[in-house]
């Protein structure tokens, strides 16, 4: 049952308590396990602040399976709360990533946050906190340009404030779901005498999804001080790969009109039983970056996780992109020539993560060629684990 002493208002309690539940989705409209969290009393629907899901589908700008999953989850939560779906926009961030190739199992990660009177006894150190933000409307002509960078940076700053975090080093993951171009969006821009960054709506090297994702990533980098704002210009987006964020995981879809931001950080003022850490893989074959994320979250291990340590891992969030080069550790690879190369990147990332954690319900996004998410060839990974008593 929900904690009767927990409050959703910080006015009556001091400490935020964030939690996560990961449940399966057997189809884009399958919300049975999600609804069961409410029916069993495991989750108070009023405490939900974010839904982060992986759906089956193409993962492209017009992935209707992703949209179907998004609508299904919103509808289920609204019914549990007894409110119109439209009322969720101001209180819940919904980010659904399409495409679950390889070992990735479709699922939803339910993020909750309540307010409690006391910090947990026996759990030393810092715990997870959650912050949310929304951008101003991102117009079609903004996508992939500095206008989007600035709007996302402002929303990330708001999310930090919402989380009660002042030090960017405490931030380990910033997820942004933004808009991508569509034929309708392009027509709208042209009708107003504006231009757009590309005529490709997809996820290829010139695809609008890549432009949007990378502008959002640079917005994260600017907000966190990873990149100075005066270094970012339109002609450096998707060009200067030395500009990047180590904690951004961004995605986009043609159905969006603005950006939703979810920030996960650690704080000594957190009552959460969870903690987050992050790492960066050095290439498509590297597992050390994943292990670093788990270790920095608080799990101490040598080469492999024990079964008990695997159970301590609540969720892994990974952004796996395609490298700009067709050479991996001195050898030629053909991933860049694959007609569904974006699925290859996700499948490889999923295999790496699941081989370590043993959990197919991991959030693996990606598929872009080159990215401002992580350094050239690298991929940002974040891990949320359960804190153990001292």
From Swiss-Prot:
Positions of the catalytic residues: 177, 251
Region (RU C): 274-390
InterPro entries hit by this protein: AtzD/Barbiturase, AtzD/Barbiturase_RUA, AtzD/Barbiturase_RUB, AtzD/Barbiturase_RUC
Pfam families: Amido_AtzD_TrzD
Domain writeup: The monomer structure is formed from three repeating units (RUs) that share the same structure as one another. The monomer and the active site possess nearly threefold rotational symmetry, to the extent that the active site possesses three potential Ser-Lys catalytic dyads, but one of the 3 active site surfaces varies in composition suggesting it is involved in conferring substrate specificity.
Leftover remarks: The structural metal found in both cyanuric acid hydrolase and barbiturase is absent in the Frankia CyAH.
Function: Cyclic amide hydrolase of unknown substrate specificity. Catalyzes the hydrolytic ring-opening of a cyclic amide. Does not act on cyanuric acid nor barbituric acid.
Protein's UniProt name: Cyclic amide hydrolase
Organism name: Pseudofrankia inefficax (strain DSM 45817 / CECT 9037 / DDB 130130 / EuI1c)
């Amino acid at each position: 049952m929900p904690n009767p002493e927990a409050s959703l208002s910080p006015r009556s309690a001091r400490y935020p308590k964030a939690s996560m539940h990961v449940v399966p989705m057997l189809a884009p409209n399958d919300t049975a396990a999600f609804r069961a969290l409410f029916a069993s009393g495991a989750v108070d629907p009023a405490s939900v602040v974010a839904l982060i899901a992986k759906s089956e589908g193409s993962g492209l700008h017009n992935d209707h399976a992703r949209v179907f999953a998004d609508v299904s989850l919103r509808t289920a939560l609204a019914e549990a709360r007894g409110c119109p779906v439209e009322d969720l926009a101001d209180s819940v961030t919904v980010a659904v990533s399409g495409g679950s190739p390889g070992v990735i199992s479709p699922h939803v990660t339910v993020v909750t946050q309540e307010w409690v009177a006391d910090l947990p006894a026996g759990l030393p150190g810092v715990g997870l906190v959650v912050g949310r933000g929304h951008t101003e409307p991102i117009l079609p002509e903004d996508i992939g340009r500095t206008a989007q960078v600035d709007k996302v940076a402002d929303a990330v700053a708001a999310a930090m404030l919402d989380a009660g975090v002042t030090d960017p080093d405490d931030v380990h993951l910033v997820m942004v779901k933004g808009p991508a171009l569509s034929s309708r969006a392009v027509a709208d821009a042209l009708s107003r005498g504006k231009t757009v960054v590309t005529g490709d709506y997809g996820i290829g090297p010139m695809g609008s999804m890549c432009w949007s994702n990378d502008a959002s990533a640079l917005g994260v980098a600017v907000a966190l001080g990873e990149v100075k704002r005066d270094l970012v210009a339109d002609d450096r987006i998707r060009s200067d790969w030395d500009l990047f964020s180590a904690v951004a995981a961004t995605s986009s879809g043609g159905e969006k009109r603005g950006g939703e931001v979810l920030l996960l950080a650690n704080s000594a003022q957190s009552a959460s039983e969870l903690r987050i850490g992050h790492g960066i893989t050095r290439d498509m074959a590297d597992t050390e970056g994943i292990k670093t994320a788990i270790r920095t979250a608080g799990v101490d291990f040598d080469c492999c996780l024990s079964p008990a340590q695997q159970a301590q891992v609540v969720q892994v969030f990974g952004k796996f992109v395609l490298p700009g080069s067709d050479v991996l550790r001195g050898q030629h690879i053909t991933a860049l020539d694959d007609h569904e190369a974006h699925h290859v990147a996700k499948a490889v990332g999923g295999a790496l993560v699941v081989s370590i954690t043993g959990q197919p319900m991991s959030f693996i996004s990606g598929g872009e060629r080159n990215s401002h998410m992580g350094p050239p060839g690298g991929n940002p990974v974040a891990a949320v684990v359960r804190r153990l008593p001292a």
